[in-house]
Amino acid sequence: MTKEQIGQAIAEARKAQGITIRKMAEMAGTSTRAIQAVEKGLYNVGIDTYLKLAQTLNMRLKFEN
């Protein structure tokens, strides 16, 4: 997946759960600006950040070869 696709999946999961960007940022311990950038695929983040966001939304990360 590209960073854009990951961001889109995060945004869709967040919206499906009725979580605002502000609430998501609070839950994940990051800024609203960072959440917006990740969701738009504009922000290169490490796997630890993706993991934190996924855990916040009860998502699973899957690595494929």
What is each PLM-predicted segment?
Residues 1-16:
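A short, Lys/Arg-rich alpha-helix, primarily the initiator
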Residues 6-9, 20, 46-49:
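Residues that mark the N-terminal boundary/hinge immediately upstream of a DNA-recognition element
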Residues 14, 25, 54:
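The alpha-helix within a helix-turn-helix
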Residues 18-37:
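Short alpha-helical DNA-recognition segment
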Residues 40, 65:
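Short, conserved catalytic or interaction motifs in soluble domains
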Residues 48-64:
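DNA major-groove recognition helix of helix-turn-helix/homeodomain DNA-binding modules
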